[in-house]
Curated annotation (Swiss-Prot):
Full protein name: Peroxynitrite isomerase 1
Motif GXWXGXG: chain residues: 17-23
Naturally occurring in which organism (per UniProt): Mycobacterium tuberculosis (strain ATCC 25618 / H37Rv)
Gene Ontology MF terms: heme binding; metal ion binding; peroxynitrite isomerase activity
Self-association and partners: Homodimer.
Keywords noted in UniProt: Heme, Iron, Isomerase, Metal-binding
Cofactor-binding details, from the entry: Binds 1 heme b group per subunit, that coordinates a highly solvent-exposed Fe(III) atom.
Pathway this chain belongs to: Nitrogen metabolism
Amino acid sequence: MTRDLAPALQALSPLLGSWAGRGAGKYPTIRPFEYLEEVVFAHVGKPFLTYTQQTRAVADGKPLHSETGYLRVCRPGCVELVLAHPSGITEIEVGTYSVTGDVIELELSTRADGSIGLAPTAKEVTALDRSYRIDGDELSYSLQMRAVGQPLQDHLAAVLHRQR
């Protein structure tokens, strides 16, 4: 048992730590881009993991995006991801997780029981889906988005590695 980790989070303990890697993004309203990403999952002894994420451009190192929030286990096999973006978007994604050997998979969405909140100046985002796969020291994910009048489609994908 990971020290002081709430029992409900034990199955997700391999997420804990710092991750870094590279990803790519695309959307019909923007040019394709590549980014460097850093993610940290931590805990404070309560029944949730803290989550911080930041990206920067591969080409010039300029900051691109960041998110902060919490990953909560609502019951075994069920998770909620609660995030805030500095662009004026908040999201609650609800989904499932499964553990098979050393592999953890999470499927999350705002479309069923989740929600998106928009500040008055935020771009219109109406749906987000995320898929995560953790296999040992590798974390990969994809994100689909429905926004600014476009249908739900692939937006981001990245592969990160555990930092020692």
